[in-house]
Amino acid sequence: MNAANRIALPEQPRILVIALRRLGDVLMATPLIHSLRQAWPKATIDALVFADTAGILEGNPDLNGIVAMPPRPTAGQGLALAARLWRQYDLAISTQCGDRPTFFALVAGRSSLAPVESTFSGRLKRALLDRSVAYAGGVHRVEEMLQLADALGIARAPRLVCPHPRAVEGVSGDYAVIHAAPMFRYKQWSKEGWRALAAWLAGRGLAVIATGGPGEAERRYLDAVCNGLSVVRRLDGRLDWPQLAGLLAKARVYVGPDTSVTHVAAAAGCPTVALYGPTDPRLWGPWPTGGLDTMWDAAGTMQRRGNVWLVQNPLPCLPCQLEGCERRLESYSACLDELSPRQVIAAVEEALG
């Protein structure tokens, strides 16, 4: 933090944080929002997000409001929102380099901040913005958010903030949570692996709860995983984000792939076993409750940071940062398909203590 560089704002400023990407990106913007709340306790802080990601901010104590926009707005909807936001905030911050979030930061804020790339369009944005951060890539997404706090001259508060937890009726005792069905095929572990893990967890005397999204493909995959497995209680498609946070906070252990639920589990303090394939954990690894003093390595059989165990099948191509071996969302990923149940169970056993 460079206090001499602190931006001058009113004592009770209005601040807008813009995060127009997927659920995980929105969650990873919460350390920036938390830093803003610590710096300006009396501020009004809102977030501009896509409507289908707003739930992950529900009950966030650092936010006063959420401005939700359609994931694919028409030109008319975009212009109407811009007119509605025009100069409504003392400070507007884009968490992305893209044209649309930067445009809304310029429109909404009397002062504006955004990351910019070293391109012609980036140089143009830098000239229009009041403050900017050079986007270089190659660092953890949370670190990118904290660099925006640095640019404002305020102290970092590197904590992911979960949705406000709410209890799930009828769930008690010792239980494990598995999240077998990510939204995209290329992040899936094998059905056989999940079945072996569920049976092992039940053998340890734990109730096994399966979570998942409402999508048809996710439901079908979980159908195949759970077929004939009476030990698994399914709550897929039935929980909102606060309920998920409440469920995860009291779980003995959570196991899941690179998905937003895994990031919530880590932030909630649950012993979390994350199964990573193509995704680079140096950029997108789970953020433990105590933060990351030592960043994740690119690849390894098992790494531990705080309450998170990160498991990989370290093939020579890992991490490729591609959408599976076929470079498409519905592709298989050999690194995950060939990840052995024995390796995952060893990490879960350690996480259970």
Task: Describe each PLM feature range.
Residues 1-353:
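Catalytic machinery of carbohydrate-active enzymes
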